[in-house]
Design a protein with these regions (language model features):
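Non-catalytic terminal/interface segments that mediate subunit docking, oligomerization
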Residues: 158-162, 169-320
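Conserved short alpha-helical segments that host acidic/polar catalytic motifs at enzyme active sites
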Residues: 1-226
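Glycine-rich phosphate/ribose-binding loops and adjacent secondary-structure elements
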Residues: 1-24, 30-35, 47, 65, ...
Length: 354
């Protein structure tokens, strides 16, 4: 990928999240007519250009009968490629031409994109808790012996999610006699797959866990984009050392919200407190909110982190403040990939499962 195009995509990625499709697109704004494919190229888009300066494009060839002698070129758009016609000039612009044209306009914004992984080099990871203190916290957050042996142990040993092939006869969460964390109540409505299938490890050019902090502004108003820095991490999951460096790096732009409650409070009033505190801090210019249950003790009980993140995230969206801040979860509850995914799904930017 040419360096100038790389800069263009870095800029675009800082204004909005990528749209995966699958989609083959034909569109016009009365100045341009374009055809394009999604970044994975999962839907076909074929084109033919004739000597009469006509462009034919669609999902199939042969939609219109053409004289083969008049055909100048024909082909198929690859993943993320685009082909356009500038109506006023009567000229066809190919993929490289359009991206060269766009790259000239936005390359200077790349000075604001900072890779945090280079600033957080980790040599030795430390355990925050050991012995009885660790066991008490595991009990507090509802860890079972099965969780430790069948979920955590394989993850620690193989650095990947545990897999099993037995049937699941676990009672439904709402009918279970045993404590079940709130994460267990969240399920996919259906098995979401790509067609054709994509391997996130072997096809990492189109699959990424990269996480960004900050936003350049309104994608529809390029003339008034902010000059704030955009920070990028390779993964939304932060180890304890990484989180320590993260807090130190953002310094005064960090504020911690306590996600515990006491006998004098209840969960509902505590969530209202969190929402009000978050709103005040964002209006004061804080860019990193840390929702933490680390203050848990015999007199302070953890609120389910999913409720905390979801409440603050939704509240800030209603006030149109969400785009000004990142919400970071520091929790002892999160145990497996499902709990990480649900936290991110309800609004967390990063998760530190301390």
């Amino acid at each position: 990928l040419p360096a100038e195009h790389q800069k263009l995509f870095n800029f675009l990625n800082s204004t909005m999240e990528p749209w995966d499709g699958p989609a083959a697109i034909a569109a016009t704004d009365n100045e341009w007519v374009i055809v394009a494919t999604d970044r994975n190229g999962l839907r076909p888009m074929r084109y033919t250009i004739t000597k009469d300066n006509l462009l034919f494009a669609g999902s199939e060839t042969g939609m219109i009968e053409l004289n083969e002698k008049k055909i100048v070129s024909k082909g198929r758009l690859g993943p993320g490629e685009i082909l356009g016609v500038r109506i006023e000039k009567g000229k066809i612009f190919k993929n490289k031409d359009i991206k060269n044209y766009l790259a000239k306009e936005y390359k200077h914004f790349n000075n604001q994109i900072i890779d945090l992984d280079k600033k957080f080099p980790i040599k030795n990871e430390t355990n925050l808790f050991k012995g009885d203190q660790l066991r008490k916290l595991q009990h507090c957050f509802g860890y079972s012996l099965e969780d430790l042996e069948l979920i955590l142990h394989p993850m620690a040993e193989d650095a990947k999610e545990a897999t099993g092939s037995m049937g699941d006869d676990t009672p439904l969460e709402v009918l279970s006699n045993k404590y079940r964390p709130l994460y267990h109540f969240f399920r996919q409505n259906f098995s979401q797959v790509t067609n054709p299938p994509i391997d996130s490890l072997r096809e990492n050019k189109v699959m990424s866990l990269k996480t960004r902090f900050g936003n350049l502004g309104n994608i529809l108003d390029f003339n008034n984009l902010t000059e704030e820095n955009i920070y990028v991490l390779n993964s939304p999951i932060l180890s304890n050392k990484q989180f320590e460096k993260f807090v130190s790096f953002f310094d005064k732009n960090n504020q911690v919200l306590d996600c515990t409650f006491t006998n004098e409070e209840n969960i509902e009033s505590s969530l209202e407190r969190l929402k009000k505190e978050a709103e005040v801090l964002v209006r004061q210019g804080v860019t990193q909110l840390i929702l933490s249950d680390k203050e848990v003790s015999k007199d302070k009980y953890p609120i389910p982190m999913l409720l905390c993140i979801g409440a603050v995230h939704t509240h800030l969206i209603k006030l149109k403040l969400r785009g000004y801040v990142s919400i970071n979860a520091q929790t002892g509850e999160a145990l497996d990939t499902h709990s990480f995914a649900t936290l991110i799904g309800v609004g967390a930017t990063t998760v530190n499962p301390y």
